[in-house]
Regions:
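Noncatalytic luminal/extracellular "stalk/propeptide" segments of secretory-pathway proteins
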Residues: 29-30, 36-39, 58, 62-173
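N-terminal capping segment at the start of a domain
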Residues: 31-71, 209-219, 288, 355, ...
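Soluble metallo-hydrolase cores and metallopeptidase-like ectodomains found primarily
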Residues: 36-39, 113-115, 121-154, 217-296, ...
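Second-shell loop/turn segments in exported
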Residues: 40-48, 62-73, 138-143, 172-188, ...
């Protein structure tokens, strides 16, 4: 079975079954009315053949491409999405604008100067400041972790380029990513505090290709506390080998553009509920991406999943009891700013948000079903789990975190 379609089906089941209103005890498995079961089975059957979700991400990445937060391309993505959602028949389509600090890379180059001159594949991290024009050259000091850097004295860091060579642990559920990004967020600040001149981190990820993975560092404005970049895994290995033989000098040239304010926005569309239209089941993804690729996986695939799932529900003969609201969040990559903006704008409506789900972790085989349901809703979690078993999806825990943007919502 196509993995993106498995993800689509999971979203459909959650969105469909969460519309139930009967009561059951926490240790029971909820009884699902026959009509709802039939709808679920129909949605699964359609979902296995449906191509709306795939077409959405294919066309988004082809016709718009990379969608850096605050850029003209992100604005085009909002216009493109509203048109697509209208063509698909959704209701109440609108954009909710907000402003963000804007950052973009202009130059990011790195090289080993001595003892073995050669280029390195690097990429500036989001929020990095610029180096002096032409770059900065200094001796490298290597640390195996952020903890090691924090424990180091300023005397050994001052005037040097810090290299954090911490590797990401490969895990099935991706939990190693959260640990790995700490160096990306904090390296520049800690380096600056210890009078280092720049920070270089081993690229976050478990692949070994000569490609550097970007992402956001901590900041309170358009830029952070110093120049910072990621280096590809093969170049990190090369740098480590050279350091084993003696001192190494490198050059980093990073030039960025930053503005205090730029436009962004959340795109919203709905399948209006037939009985309780004021009550909302939110399905979210983020529309922005970084600029080094097309944003197909992060998070074009997530937007394809939620749009495809909601469209299948829209195609049913009868509307759902509650409103299904799609939110294509803006500016997630640069600080979950769309999530903050939505939570602030809709603060008075949170009592009407019944459930939220987000797709922002790629599209691959679904192997486990985790939830975060209240005690009274746990029987429905168990019912959903039972219905997912034929797809090879195992029961999980009730401690799910949802996703970055919906994590900004108050407890539902």
């Amino acid at each position: 079975m196509n993995s993106s379609r498995r993800t689509l089906i999971l979203r459909l089941w959650v969105a469909s079954l969460c519309l139930l209103t009967s009561v059951a005890h926490a240790q029971d498995v909820a009884e699902i009315p026959d009509a709802v079961r039939e709808n679920v089975e129909l949605l699964v059957h359609k979902g296995l053949e449906d191509t709306v979700g795939y077409a959405f991400v294919r066309d988004l990445t082809t016709e718009v491409g990379p969608r850096l937060a605050g850029s003209e391309a992100e604005a085009r993505a909002r216009s493109w999405s509203t048109q697509k959602l209208a063509e698909l028949g959704f209701a109440n389509i609108r954009t909710e604008p907000f402003t963000i600090p804007y950052w973009s890379r202009r130059v990011d180059r790195g090289s080993i100067v001595s003892p073995a001159p050669q280029n390195m594949v690097i990429t500036a991290l989001g929020g990095s400041t610029s180096t002096p024009p032409g770059g900065v050259e200094a001796e490298v000091i290597r640390f195996e972790s952020m903890r090691e850097l924090r424990a180091a004295s300023s005397d050994i860091v001052a005037g040097k380029i810090v290299f954090i060579d911490e590797k990401m642990t490969r895990t099935q559920d991706g939990s190693g990513y959260g640990m790995a990004v700490r160096k990306r967020r904090n390296c520049a600040t800690t380096t600056s505090e210890k009078d280092g001149v720049a920070c270089l981190i081993r690229s976050v990820g478990t692949q070994d290709r000569r490609f550097a993975h970007t992402g956001m560092m901590s900041r309170s404005a358009a830029v952070g506390d110093g120049p910072a970049a990621a280096v590809s895994p093969p170049d990190a290995e090369q740098l480590t080998r050279l350091l084993e033989n003696g001192p190494v000098r490198i050059r980093l040239d990073i030039q960025v553009e930053a503005q205090s304010e730029a436009p962004s926005g959340n795109v919203i569309a709905e399948v209006v509920g037939r009985e309780r239209p004021e009550e909302v089941v939110l399905l979210g993804c983020h529309l922005d991406s970084w600029d080094l690729g097309t944003g197909a996986v992060d998070d074009g695939a997530g937007c394809g999943i939620v749009v495809g799932a909601a469209h299948l529900i829209l195609s049913l003969d009868e509307a759902p009891r509650r409103t299904i609201r799609i939110v294509l969040y803006g500016a997630e990559e640069v600080g979950v700013l769309g999530g903050h903006a939505y939570a602030k704008r809709h603060a008075d409506e949170m009592d009407h948000h019944i459930l939220a789900a987000e797709s922002d972790f790629g599209a691959d085989k679904i192997y486990r079903f985790d939830t975060r349901f209240g005690e009274g809703a746990l029987p429905y979690a168990r019912a959903i789990q039972q219905m997912l078993e034929p797809l090879g999806i195992a029961p999980g825990h009730n401690l799910a975190g949802g996703g970055p943007d919906i994590s900004m919502l108050p407890e539902l």
